[in-house]
């Protein structure tokens, strides 16, 4: 085990470990988020629209990055994917002729607007991201 000879060296050693832990957390959290988002398709069968699969392919992540005394990663759903497909079956049931991608993703998450699927995937993902981060930091900084 390396011994720091100065506070600056100690800080660098700690930040290197935090960066490694956050890189591990990001990898696990990204996979868990993909699994949760894909689970949306495990329930419900739409009758007035055809699933595009865009939600399931929308998970994006940035690798761990450091700046000063902080390390972070970001996981999000890419809402720039186009789902603006007019659907006359929607208007005949009182819905708008189309929904924007953010509206579709929000309806899928909340289980509203007639969107069929296992809702709550983002809330579950968020909890797993926190847990994955805690687990990774605990693994790297566990007392021995």
Enumerate the language-model features and the residues they cover.
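Short, Lys/Arg-rich flexible segments
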Residues: 1-76, 93, 97-144
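Short, surface-exposed beta-strand/loop "edge" segments at domain boundaries and coil↔beta transitions
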Residues: 79-93
């Amino acid at each position: 085990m390396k011994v720091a000879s100065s506070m600056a060296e100690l800080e660098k050693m700690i930040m290197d470990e935090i960066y490694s832990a956050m890189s591990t957390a990001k990898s696990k959290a990204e996979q868990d988020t993909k699994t949760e988002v894909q689970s949306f398709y495990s329930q419900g069968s739409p009758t007035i629209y055809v699933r595009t699969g865009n939600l399931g392919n929308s998970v994006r992540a940035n690798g761990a990055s450091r700046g000063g005394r902080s390390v972070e990663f970001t996981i999000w759903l890419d809402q720039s994917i186009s789902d603006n497909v007019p659907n006359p079956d929607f208007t005949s049931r009182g819905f708008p002729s189309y929904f924007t991608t953010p509206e579709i993703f929000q309806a899928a998450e909340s289980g509203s607007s007639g969107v069929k699927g296992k809702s709550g995937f983002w809330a579950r993902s968020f909890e797993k991201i926190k847990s994955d981060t805690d687990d990774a930091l605990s693994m790297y900084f566990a007392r021995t």
